[in-house]
From Swiss-Prot:
Xref: Pfam families: Ribosomal_L10
Protein's name according to its UniProt entry: Large ribosomal subunit protein uL10
Similarity-based family: Belongs to the universal ribosomal protein uL10 family.
A GO molecular function held by the record: structural constituent of ribosome
Organism: Actinobacillus pleuropneumoniae serotype 5b (strain L20)
Any GO BP: translation
Length: 163
């Protein structure tokens, strides 16, 4: 079905709005994936706070113009599925990576974060805010415990020398 000018403008505006509020974007090719599997992916995307859309490449190029995802225009070839992460930069990458492992037909084309093309695997392994805080706290606790052990060992050695 051919789209009229107003429909095209609405699509460009919608995708542009999603791009402006997004932290990262991931581009994929979903040829060969069944409708049932794509429906599952869309449901998972909604739960993860990810906006997903299949858009014509020419409209997508116009939609990302002037945004930090303009660097992805080289990946807009063939059927293009784009996902924008709104809550966590790695959400879309993690979702697509897991889906690609289960569905060999699903091909990841690229990802962008902070205006630069990034490896999808890199984005998928980014810790969430809570995970990063937990790692930081673990490191701080570990450092404090290590310092205590070294202090006690030094005190023990000093007492042994005095005796």
């Amino acid at each position: 079905m051919a789209l009229n000018l107003q429909d095209k403008q609405a699509i460009v505006a919608e995708v542009n709005e999603a791009a402006k509020g997004a932290l990262s974007a991931v581009v994929a090719d979903s040829r060969g994936v069944t409708v049932e599997k794509m429906t599952e992916l869309r449901k998972s995307a909604r739960e993860a706070g990810v906006t997903m859309r299949v858009v014509r490449n020419t409209l997508l190029r116009r939609a990302v113009e002037g945004t930090e995802f303009e660097c992805l225009t080289d990946t807009f070839t063939g059927p293009t599925l784009i996902a924008f992460s709104h809550e966590h930069p790695g959400a879309a990458a993690r979702l697509f990576t897991e889906f690609a492992k289960a569905n060999k037909e699903f091909e990841l084309k690229g990802a962008a974060f902070e205006g630069k093309v990034q490896d999808v695997e890199f984005l998928a392994t980014l810790p969430t805010y809570e995970e990063a805080i937990a790692r930081l706290m673990g490191t701080m606790k570990e450092a404090a415990a290590g310092k205590l052990v070294r202090t006690l060992a030094a005190l023990r050695d000093k007492l042994q020398e005095a005796a």
